[in-house]
């Protein structure tokens, strides 16, 4: 609160806490802050759910079928090493200033942590357990449902935990690049106005990535 004034720090660099609080009250009503936060949350949830489902399904498919892995691995590797957020402007050009580009960026970012964790767990599977199940005449689906799937659940949840934080990053970056709704758009909007206090308010609404990874 008093640090910026005592240290001679300009308010546009570090505004006092009272100004941030008053600005939060103002934009809560006049700028529909709650609505923009809801849009960002919806994009994060949709991107996280769809990206996680795709990553898990393809991860299990690659783990179960070496042939599928041999066919898809080169394409997945090329996509994995590409910077995912760089696709945001392209998605905006294709789909316009809607929710869809942000959701696609989130899906792309979420997809790989889940895929890699699941596939790594499938590769590290104890084959003695699989052979034991087969010795009891278990079908391929039974082996997967009773042995492989339960064994890989810790890795799956670990991937989901990482992906949940990355989904927020993907959506906000998409909104920063080409958005007219959401918290990322609000950051750009208030930055253009030189309203540092409002920027701090929006940042405070974003999930804490470090806290989510603990």
Segments from the language model and where they lie:
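Cytoplasmic-entry segments and transmembrane alpha-helices of multi-pass inner-membrane transporters
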Residues: 56-93, 103-106, 116-123, 131
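Periplasmic/extracellular loop-to-transmembrane helix junction in inner-membrane transport proteins
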Residues: 6-49
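Hydrophobic alpha-helical transmembrane segments of polytopic membrane proteins
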Residues: 184-214
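Hydrophobic alpha-helical transmembrane segments of multipass integral membrane proteins
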Residues: 34, 38, 42-62, 153, ...
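Transmembrane alpha-helices
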Residues: 104, 108, 141-174, 204-208
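Short cytoplasmic-facing helical segments at TM-TM junctions of multi-pass membrane proteins
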Residues: 117-162, 183, 187
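Loop-to-helix entry region at the N-terminal start of transmembrane alpha-helices
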Residues: 35-43, 93-114, 157, 198-203
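Hydrophobic alpha-helical elements at and bordering transmembrane segments
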Residues: 24, 33, 37, 41, ...
């Amino acid at each position: 609160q008093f640090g910026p004034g005592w240290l001679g720090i300009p308010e546009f660099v570090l505004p006092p806490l009272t100004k941030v609080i008053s600005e939060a009250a103002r934009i809560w009503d006049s700028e529909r802050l709650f609505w923009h936060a809801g849009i960002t949350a919806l994009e994060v949830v949709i991107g996280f759910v769809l990206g996680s489902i795709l990553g898990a399904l393809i991860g299990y498919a690659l783990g179960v079928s070496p042939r599928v892995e041999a066919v898809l691995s080169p394409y997945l590797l090329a996509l994995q090493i590409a910077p995912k957020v760089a696709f945001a402007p392209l998605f905006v050009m294709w789909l316009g200033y809607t929710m869809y580009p942000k959701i696609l960026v989130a899906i792309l970012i979420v997809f790989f942590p889940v895929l890699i964790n699941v596939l790594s767990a499938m590769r590290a599977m104890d084959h003695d357990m699989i052979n034991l199940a087969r010795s009891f005449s278990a079908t391929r689906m039974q082996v997967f449902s009773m042995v492989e799937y339960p064994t890989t659940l810790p890795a799956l949840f670990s991937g989901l935990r990482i992906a949940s934080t990355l989904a927020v990053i993907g959506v906000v970056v998409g909104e920063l690049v080409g958005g007219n709704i959401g918290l990322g758009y609000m950051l750009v909007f208030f930055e253009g106005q030189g309203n540092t206090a409002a920027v701090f308010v929006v940042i405070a609404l974003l999930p804490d990535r470090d806290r989510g990874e603990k």
